[in-house]
């Protein structure tokens, strides 16, 4: 195998190894052993009109695979916040930030969001999170969107659709080229996010 080919393959292998090691340390924060596929990232990124996006957030930014897709579409004067708490993956995102000043890495829990965004992309494994935390994150996301803003969330099952409906109107699509296949939800807020769900989830208000 040529050195040129190895130089292309080894970084990809290292990314996968880093992701799996982070999964082993904190599986509840990831939801799956495998990072998102390029097709899933593309489907999520194509869910918004990028000409209208001045400030976006990515929750659960992982190893940066979706982050790169979003940056490739982001306007030159726009901002993308990447939220992540695992130290090793935060360091990887900071390296990406050093190459692209439009990226701002936020080393905080997603439920601490206080900004306003035109789009929020979420890779958080909502079903794996405690019910109260899940409710706080969805409420924060709902309230953090500007008028006309969109919340894009992918999940591996449809179990939480009733919970999503407490905050958002949504449509969904299915991406089979991913391990495992995933549902992508494109969500717009109800007029009032401060409601209490009638599902089994307790929604904080």
Residue ranges of predicted features:
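Class I SAM-dependent methyltransferase Rossmann-like catalytic core
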Residues: 12-48
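Conserved SAM/SAH-binding beta-strand->alpha-helix loop
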Residues: 86-88
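Glycine-rich SAM-binding Motif I of class I
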Residues: 64-68
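Conserved beta-strand signature within the Rossmann-like core of class I S-adenosyl-L-methionine
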Residues: 148-156
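Conserved SAM-binding loop
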Residues: 93-94
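A short glycine-rich, Lys/Arg-flanked "PGG" loop and its adjoining helix->strand segment in the class I
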Residues: 135-147
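Conserved SAM-binding strand-loop segment of SAM-dependent methyltransferases
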Residues: 99-110
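Conserved class I S-adenosyl-L-methionine
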Residues: 53-62
């Amino acid at each position: 195998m040529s050195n040129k080919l190895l130089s292309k393959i080894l970084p990809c292998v290292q990314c996968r190894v880093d992701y799996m090691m982070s999964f082993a340390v904190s599986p509840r924060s990831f939801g799956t052993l495998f990072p998102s596929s390029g097709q899933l990232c593309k489907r999520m990124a194509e869910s918004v009109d990028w000409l209208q996006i001045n400030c976006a957030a990515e929750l659960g930014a992982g190893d940066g695979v979706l982050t790169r897709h979003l940056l490739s579409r982001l306007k030159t004067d726009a901002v993308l916040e990447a939220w992540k708490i695992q130290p090793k993956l935060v360091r990887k995102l900071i390296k990406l930030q050093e190459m692209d000043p439009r990226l701002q890495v936020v080393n905080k829990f997603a439920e601490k969001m206080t900004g306003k965004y035109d789009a929020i992309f979420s890779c958080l494994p909502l079903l794996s999170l405690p019910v109260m935390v899940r409710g706080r994150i969805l409420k924060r996301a709902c309230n953090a969107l500007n008028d006309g803003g969109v919340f894009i969330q992918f999940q591996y099952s449809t179990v939480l659709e009733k919970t999503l409906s407490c905050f958002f109107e949504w449509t969904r699509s299915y991406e089979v080229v991913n391990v495992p296949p995933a549902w992508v939800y494109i969500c717009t807020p109800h007029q009032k996010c401060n409601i209490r769900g009638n599902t089994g989830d307790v929604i904080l208000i």
